[in-house]
Regions:
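Flexible helix-coil transition and linker loops at the boundaries of alpha-helical arrays
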Residues: 66-69, 102-115, 129, 143, ...
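TPR alpha-solenoid repeat register
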Residues: 76, 110-111, 118, 153, ...
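Structural motif corresponding to the intra-repeat A-B loop/turn of tetratricopeptide repeats
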Residues: 87, 129-130, 164, 211, ...
């Protein structure tokens, strides 16, 4: 591991495992948002490392030894929950997280990432264990009271409501998560929200469509498509919004021209293939019409090859 810190005696890592940086002395660490100056990309852990049983047992033994000496250590109770959760032991993880929450101080620091992880993971394992909705919502309420600037609580709840088909609640949670992320930033918070932004906007678009709020649905879909023209889910939702609002094919093509480049063959093919998949003959006819003759021939040949099962060149 490369450590990007000055070698000074008051700046040290502490902890037998899950070590973290501390500054000794009364002043402590001064945190700042320097993400515009320096950012790190964590690519995650290899699957083999996650499945390493010997490492799991070593970590578990170290954590249990620390907790034997300090049973009310909320950080290590949280680590205990993480360790059980990574091994698929959700009930043991839930119990450890609940003990961690009970051992937390009344007031948490605004950048207390470990406590944020504990609450977030408690929400997730409780959802996996199909705990009663009222109990999960009570955990969420307590988490927000302790760490009101953390968007991950709202994000995790939004994802849960979405899976349950409770679209109004899901939209509310996702919008709240994004608002917090934009307001309070990502220093020691918002790791899940940040990683799920595109998925959240896709769900917001489709959720608002299901709720009949087409104006918001269109806005969310446009945000996604301006980032990625190939996002078929957002494009399908957008076209469905127009269809349900009785927008003509001509107006749809005109609107999509603000997002897609009609001089770019790749953009034109994306739109044509989606129109064909939706069975929208009117849009298919119009998107075929903006292809140049040679592009149309190449597209038809490629589609014929694909339908025959032969490999595309």
């Amino acid at each position: 591991m490369i450590r990007f810190f000055v070698n000074r005696p008051d700046l040290r890592y502490v902890g037998k495992i899950h070590e973290h940086l501390v500054r000794k002395g009364r002043s402590g660490l001064h945190l700042t948002d320097a993400t515009k100056q320096l950012a790190f990309l964590h690519t995650g852990y290899q699957e083999q490392e996650k499945k390493d049983k010997s490492k799991f047992e070593r970590n578990l033994n170290i954590i249990l030894e620390i907790l034997k000496q300090d049973p009310e250590n909320c950080d290590y109770l949280g680590y205990l929950g993480d360790t059980y959760s990574s091994d698929g032991k959700n009930e043991e993880a839930r119990d450890a997280y609940k003990k961690a929450v009970a051992a937390m101080p009344e007031k948490l620091g605004v950048y207390d990432q470990r406590s944020s992880y504990t609450y977030t993971n408690l929400l997730r394992v409780s959802q996996c264990l199909n705990e009663p909705e009222a109990e999960v919502e009570a955990i969420y309420k307590e988490a927000v009271e302790k760490l009101p600037k953390e968007p991950d609580f709202d994000c995790v709840m939004g994802e849960w409501y979405w899976r349950k088909g409770q679209y109004e609640k899901a939209v509310q949670m996702y919008e709240l998560a994004i608002a917090k992320l934009e307001t309070y930033g990502t220093v020691n918070r918002g790791i899940i929200t940040t990683s799920m932004l595109i998925q959240m906007y896709e769900c917001l678009g489709e959720g608002c469509r299901k709720l009949g709020d087409y104006q918001k649905a269109v806005r969310y879909c446009v945000i996604v498509l301006n980032t990625d023209h190939k996002d078929v889910d957002a494009l399908l939702t957008l076209i469905n919004c127009f269809a349900e609002s009785n927008v003509s094919a001509e107006e749809v093509v005109q609107f999509l021209g603000k997002i897609y480049d009609y001089s770019d063959i790749k953009d034109k093919v994306i739109l044509l293939r989606v129109a064909m998949a939706m069975g929208r003959k009117d849009l298919e006819r119009m998107f075929r019409g903006i292809l140049l003759p040679q592009e149309r021939e190449e597209f038809d040949a490629a589609m014929e090859t694909a339908q025959s099962g032969a490999p595309l060149s």
